[in-house]
Structures are given as C-alpha cells and as structure tokens.
C-alpha cells in the first residue's frame, strides 16, 4: 500500500479554521503564535478563519482575529465577505463588529500615496489678498481705478459672452465679461441695490498699465489689478443685456458653469459662493436685526449695537462653506465600484455617492454613514484623494476612496433611486465611449468623474 503524503501546512490551516468555527480562542491563539502567517489563509472554498467565526456566531473569535490584523475585505468563491456571511445568518452583533472595526490591513489594491491634483473650480487667476479687505481706502481707490475688473452677476449667474474657439466637447467656449469702472459706475452709485465683493488681484502683473492715462497719480499706483464681483437686481440685469446684446447671464448653473475656462471657473466659484451667502444672511442670525457688509464683502456685521455677535469672533459673521463627502466605493475584491443615481438625474446617469458631513463627525465616519444610509453597503477603509469647490452654492466636495466590507445593496428610496455594482470593464467603456453605453457618468470637470477615473487607473492589471 502506498502511504498518503502529509501536508503539514494544509493540516495547520484546517485546524485553524476548525478552531474558529468551534469558537476556541485559546487554540487559535496557540496556532497563530506559532504560525502568524496563517491568519488570512483560505480553504478550498475560499473561506478564512474570520469567515468561519462569522458563520458560526462567535463574536469573541471575530474580535480576536480583528485584533490580530486579519483582512476582513477578503471574499470567498461565492463572492462573500465575512460581513456578508454574518449578516446572512442573522448575527447582527458580529456584523456590526466587522463593519465598524478600525484600522486593519490596508486593501492590496489601494496605492500608498495619491498624487495631488487640481480639480475644476479649484484653479484661479487671482491672489485673494485678504490683507486688503480691511483697507477701506485702498478698496475705494481700486473701485474707480481704470484697470479694475468687474464681474457682473444676476441671481448668482455670471455675465458671459461666447468666445471664438470651440472646445473638444463641441461646446462653444464661454468667457466671462470683464467690465471696467465706466461700465458699472451707475450701479456703484446705488450701494443699497448691489452687492460688491473684492475677489483679489491678478497673479501676474500687467505690463504697460494704463493707470496714468486714466488720471491715477504715479505715487498712488501699486501695479495691482483688482477684481470685484458685482451682484445686481434682475431689473438692472435685463436693462444691461438690452444694451449689450453679445452678453448674457449664464443659466442654469449646472451644467452651464462647466463651460467656463478653468481659471475663470475658479474665480466664479469664489464669487458665486460669497454672493450666495450674502443673499441668505441679510439679517443677523443671532438677533434678527439688519446687517451691513464689511471687509470687502467677506463679513456681515449686525447694526444692533448690543448684539452678542459683536463680541468676539463668530462664524455667523463670515461666509460659510458646507463640507460634503463624495466617495468612490470599491468592492472588497477591487474589481467593481458602487455607483448610484437620484431621481432628478438625466436618464441613465450614475455617479459616486455623496452627502453632507454632520457636526462632530470625521470625514471617514461621514463616508461610512452616508454609504450605508443610501445603499445599505458597509464600508471599512477610507482614503482621501482630492477635493473640489462646488459653488451650488458653497460646498466643498471632499473626494475619497472607500472600500466596502459588505456587498449586498439595500437602497433607501428616500435617499437615492438606484445603486449598482459596475465592473471595471463597464466603467472603462463608459469613460471611453460615453453615452453610447447603457449608462453614463458625470463629465470630466466633476470630481465624481475624476474619482472614477482614479479607481480605473490604479487597477491596470485587472
């Protein structure tokens, strides 16, 4: 008779898995102290010790294995994670334990470093020069300076004109109308009917400044070209359009604002967000009295002398920014991504999930909460990628990659209409062939598009 050749490693793995299934923590500890490399080893069906513990309802074993650093994102041959298994068999305590575990091994398909990138709305032509906002004499002098640039807004929509070139997207090139003091002198004479915001000065000094030709004394010339955003009333805007037939106010904001040149878009993002704040905070949030504009449009001050907001520094006096997490959720095995859609989206459009950060919440926890609320999918590891100002009216989109630790989708219809897992091949086809496919994603100037592209790019061998 021929003897059966033993496989000591296979026997050790089998013993490890049996101990996990039986809930024997002491035996597990002994095996792993001798052979720690067996922690994430799988059986023939792709199951790990963590999966066996989850299947048989042993929270103490699950906790022990998590503390040892086991990889909870691994999937078996049935495409299930340990969390999927625990949820299926009704072990809620274990499912919560797996979903909320901190740290752990970083998924293999995430890169260690993310290259810094500039998204649309984040580039600009200007240096904001916040040091000039308190200098009322300087601001007043710049208002009538011949080189000063004014951007006109009506209902938060910028005044633009069509350029002579065509962009690759076949959309006509849209450019901001850069007005000068004579164009807006009449509006500036009626400060109660306008909103004026100092945006900054041009990053590049102009050569051959026409300042002296405009009557500016040489000793008062500093060479700085100031830009202002000027919000006017709808009636005045209509009258202006009638006198300038080549100009119009860009509307609706989405997707119209995506037609701007990149550096001009950054200026509009700044201007639109501050103007939106002014339109919403005409009265003091503390006492309800009227407010007045100061610091070049970057502060509103209550006119009531006894208002508590005048004592110390209060965030209600300054423009607000609303932080939003937007995340590319990646399947535990790294081969798929989760995209969703809202009812208001164009038919066929899917994008990254997103949501506002709540008070007292970290970016990572906001990502996990929003993904679970909208799709029912639980997320483990979260990695920051890049951010994008989003002037709708004043959000900051914080882009992240998020690795799922469960795969079952349970859409909350009050949050979104649909959510699905898409393969890398499907996403690549959409990025290269656009709307010829069964679904499409936001345009390249949206951070969602860049997050999706980032995920595709970091998996070149899949």
UniProtKB/Swiss-Prot annotation:
Nudix hydrolase domain residues: 319-453
Intervals holding ANK repeats: 11-40, 45-74, 78-98
Motif (Nudix box): 355-376
Binding locations of Mg(2+) 1: 354, 374, 415
SUPFAM superfamilies cross-referenced by the UniProt entry: Ankyrin repeat, Nudix
Residues the record lists as binding Mg(2+) 2: 370
Any single GO CC term annotated in Swiss-Prot or TrEMBL for this entry: cytoplasm
Catalyzed reaction equations: a 5'-end NAD(+)-phospho-ribonucleoside in mRNA + H2O = a 5'-end phospho-adenosine-phospho-ribonucleoside in mRNA + beta-nicotinamide D-ribonucleotide + 2 H(+); NAD(+) + H2O = beta-nicotinamide D-ribonucleotide + AMP + 2 H(+); NADH + H2O = reduced beta-nicotinamide D-ribonucleotide + AMP + 2 H(+); NADPH + H2O = reduced beta-nicotinamide D-ribonucleotide + adenosine 2',5'-bisphosphate + 2 H(+)
UniProt family annotation: Belongs to the Nudix hydrolase family. NudC subfamily.
InterPro entries registered for this protein in UniProt: Ankyrin_rpt, Ankyrin_rpt-contain_sf, NAD-cap_RNA_hydrolase_NudC, NADH_PPase-like_N, NudC-like_C, NUDIX_hydrolase-like_dom_sf, NUDIX_hydrolase_CS, NUDIX_hydrolase_dom
Protein's name according to its UniProt entry: NAD-capped RNA hydrolase NUDT12
Organism per entry: Mus musculus (Mouse)
Residues reported in the UniProt entry to bind Zn(2+): 284, 287, 302, 307
Keyword Cytoplasm: yes
Subcellular location, record wording: Cytoplasm; Peroxisome; Cytoplasmic granule
Keyword tags: ANK repeat, Cytoplasm, Hydrolase, Magnesium, Metal-binding, NAD, NADP, Peroxisome, Repeat, Zinc
Cited function: mRNA decapping enzyme that specifically removes the nicotinamide adenine dinucleotide (NAD) cap from a subset of mRNAs by hydrolyzing the diphosphate linkage to produce nicotinamide mononucleotide (NMN) and 5' monophosphate mRNA. The NAD-cap is present at the 5'-end of some RNAs; in contrast to the canonical N7 methylguanosine (m7G) cap, the NAD cap promotes mRNA decay. Preferentially acts on NAD-capped transcripts in response to nutrient stress. Also acts on free nicotinamide adenine dinucleotide molecules: hydrolyzes NAD(H) into NMN(H) and AMP, and NADPH into NMNH and 2',5'-ADP.
Gene: Nudt12
